[in-house]
Regions:
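Short, small/polar residue-rich loop motifs at catalytic or cofactor-binding pockets
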Residues: 158-161
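Radical SAM/AdoMet-radical enzyme domain recognition
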Residues: 1-98
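Radical SAM enzyme core and accessory elements
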Residues: 170-172, 181-184, 189, 213-290
């Protein structure tokens, strides 16, 4: 608290949702321990945010999910992360498929594009009427940032990436925490400095790939500016023209951007006029009542 640290807590909604997949190493539910940690942070006045994974199970209950964070936890900073993983039998013994592997099968817990789109739209409709400027949902804030031409603050919605490397316990450094595979290893902190690795040609190429590998369908899309193809790890589908590199969640993101476009346009006007984007709430209520 003294140093203004913001602590990220992994919690996937109410107990029923969280405990579906969040087990400890003994296979036991972890909800109560997570809540104990949250209550400890609250007791000492430490700012925290929720990092919530959206999966095949909890995605069907968007309002229960959101209202738990808002009404029960009074959590003002929320990150929603859609879980999309492919599984395969790699020669190195790993189960998760990297982007370079084409034979991975979608894991059963992965969210569908339709679920993701419905999840985001449903929560946005609740948020835009009541909570703008009070409860901050990272994806909504980042979408508005892209709408007004600012940096989105998260790599998945940026034009280029490569600034979020990860270090393992043994000092190995990888290009991204979604790409912890041998083929994306940059080196080890005991042999190279972070500066060397982060500004290496390999990492520069990795970051530029986010935009340079987009299929034509994305480049022609009216919402390309809003998502920039999202995270490269999810780009394992073929475009309508048969090009590789289409994001698995494309349909869901398109549904979301198309749904929120009028509200984002309004907030953009308010922002550029140096007024509060939260004014959208009154406008949204009037729009709904017409």
């Amino acid at each position: 608290r003294e140093n203004n640290f913001l602590v990220g807590i992994s919690i996937d909604g109410p107990q029923e949702f969280h405990d579906e997949y969040r087990k400890n190493k003994m296979g036991q539910p972890s909800f109560y321990k997570v809540m104990k940690g949250i209550n400890l942070l609250k007791k000492h006045g430490v700012e925290w945010n929720a990092m919530a994974v959206v999966n095949d199970y909890n995605a069907d209950y968007p309002l229960d999910f959101y209202r738990f964070f808002r009404d029960e936890l009074d959590c003002h900073y929320i990150q929603f992360t859609p879980i999309v993983e492919r599984l395969s039998n790699r020669a190195d013994g790993l189960r998760l498929s990297s982007l370079k592997q084409k034979d991975g099968e979608l894991a059963s817990f992965s969210i569908t594009p339709e679920q993701w789109g419905n999840f985001l739209c449903t929560i946005f409709d609740e948020w835009v009427l009541n909570d703008v400027g009070n409860y901050y949902i990272q994806l909504f804030d980042s979408t508005l940032a892209n709408w007004v031409g600012q940096q989105p603050g998260i790599c998945s919605l940026a034009k280029y990436c490569g600034h979020a490397a990860v270090m393992e316990f043994n000092g190995d450094v990888y290009a991204c925490d979604h790409f912890v595979f041998p083929e994306y290893k940059l080196g080890n902190i005991y042999q190279k400095t972070l500066v060397e690795m982060m500004y290496s040609k390999e990492q520069e190429t990795f970051g530029a790939m986010k935009h340079n590998s987009l299929p034509q369908q994305c480049l022609n899309c009216s919402y390309e500016f809003a998502c920039h193809g999202e995270c490269p790890k999810n780009r394992f589908m073929l475009s309508k023209d048969g090009e590789p590199g289409l994001n698995y969640l494309c349909k869901g993101y398109y549904q979301f951007f198309d749904h929120v476009a009028p509200y984002m346009d309004f907030m953009k006007k308010e922002y550029l006029a140096e007024r509060a984007p939260a004014n959208v709430m009154e406008w949204a209520r009037e729009r709904r009542n017409k």
